[in-house]
Design a protein with these regions (language model features):
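Glycine-rich beta-to-alpha transition loops that act as phosphate-gripper elements at the mouths
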Residues: 71-74, 95, 195, 214-220, ...
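Structural motif
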Residues: 63, 83, 111, 207, ...
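Hydrophobic faces of well-ordered beta-strands that scaffold small-molecule active sites
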Residues: 37-40, 67-69, 88-92, 116, ...
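N-terminal capping/small domains of soluble enzymes
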Residues: 1-123
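An N-cap/entry alpha-helix motif that binds or orients negatively charged groups
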Residues: 1-30, 139-196
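Conserved, mostly hydrophobic/aromatic
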Residues: 39, 60, 118, 204, ...
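Alpha-helix-loop-beta-strand connector modules within alpha/beta enzyme cores
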Residues: 78-89, 144-150, 194-212, 244-268, ...
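Alpha/beta catalytic cores of nucleotide-metabolism and tRNA/nucleoside-modifying enzymes
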Residues: 1-9, 251-268, 273-322
Length: 322
């Protein structure tokens, strides 16, 4: 649905402008990035390609775009932070246990992450029927089907042998018992504070020393109130995976931009696959676009080289359109 909305947005070109030099550099939170897009937070990325978090972090640092590490990543805050050059973003699924929350924030800050992204749009676990039908599980179930899939994907299998079976590396240290991976998944899920409120945001605001972005907003009233608590809002419907009947962020973007004015930063994701999509988001009022699936699809196809190629294609498309 997100992509259908994007496909129905058209930009009318204007010509006779003389020589045009496209400048993609974008300033956000007093840092200048080389493009107006970054890598969105995606949980358990290493299920798709072993070592994915580290590959994406290294790429983002090399090409000077932000990479957002998820709370439910397969690599630790510290290990990924080493490759981000003090310009990483950390996405927080707010834990119920405030001691864990405070420790996560300290670890992220001490590891050089400069922007905190707080996810607000998971008050309940959604029914993801496609995942159920596909048999997706964490950890992966070992059966004839997965053995066959591993056999026909030798590079993925070799990567698993090198990096090990994906784990909740960021949350593992808080697991008191030495349970198996299934129990660790249950523990990580049990710690997610599904009912986020403004008081919780205020508490985080008093702890975190850098910019804070609130992710998952879709309503004008929430966006207006958020101005008093955070430094930017991040319009998202979780890539269409959380609530099927919610609108696309692109549909609500123009009105929210009108209500917030021109100066308050708006970030957007969900359905953005190409440079054309990025330009559409910018023209409708976003300051920055976050992209997820294209990078992990490219990783699954060609590993780190694939992610780098995806970045090149998206950036080249933006320059071409401009």
């Amino acid at each position: 649905y997100n992509q259908e909305i994007l496909k129905n947005v058209f930009l009318t070109p204007r010509y006779l402008k003389g020589t045009v030099e496209a400048d993609l550099k974008t300033k956000l939170f007093d840092r200048v990035y080389d493009a107006p897009f970054g890598i969105a937070p995606i949980g358990m990325t290493s299920l798709i390609w072993p070592g994915a978090e580290l590959s994406l972090a290294k790429l983002a640092s090399e090409v000077n775009i932000p990479y957002t590490l998820s709370t439910v990543a397969c690599a630790s805050i510290e290990n990924v932070g080493k490759h981000l050059g003090n310009k990483g973003w950390f996405q927080l699924y707010p834990p119920k246990d405030k001691n864990i929350r405070d420790d996560l924030l300290k670890r992220a800050y001490d590891s050089g992450y400069e922007v905190l992204v707080i996810t607000s749009d998971i008050p309940a676990s959604s029914r993801r029927e496609r995942l159920r039908k596909a048999g997706v599980s964490v950890p992966p179930k070992i059966n004839l089907r997965t053995i066959f899939q591993a056999a026909i994907s030798p590079m993925w299998s070799l990567g698993i042998l090198k990096h090990g079976m994906p784990q909740f590396a960021t949350m593992d240290k808080y697991q008191k018992s030495q349970g198996n991976e299934k129990s660790k998944k249950g523990y990580a899920g049990s710690q997610m504070n599904r009912y986020l409120d403004w008081n919780y945001l205020e508490e985080v605001r008093n702890i975190w020393k850098g910019p804070i972005v609130l992710k998952g907003l879709m309503d004008n009233r929430d966006a207006l109130k958020a101005k008093d608590y955070v430094d930017a809002i991040y319009l998202s419907n979780h890539g269409g995976r959380q609530l099927d009947i919610a609108p696309s962020p692109l549909q609500v973007l123009p009105n929210i931009r009108k209500d917030l004015g021109d100066e308050f930063p708006i970030i957007i994701d969900s359905g953005f696959y190409s440079g054309q999509d990025v330009v559409k988001g910018l023209m409708l009022g976003a300051d920055f676009v976050m992209i997820g699936r294209p990078f992990v699809i490219a990783l699954a196809a060609l590993g780190a080289r694939g992610a780098a190629h995806a970045h090149y294609i998206i950036k080249d498309e933006i320059e071409n359109i401009m």
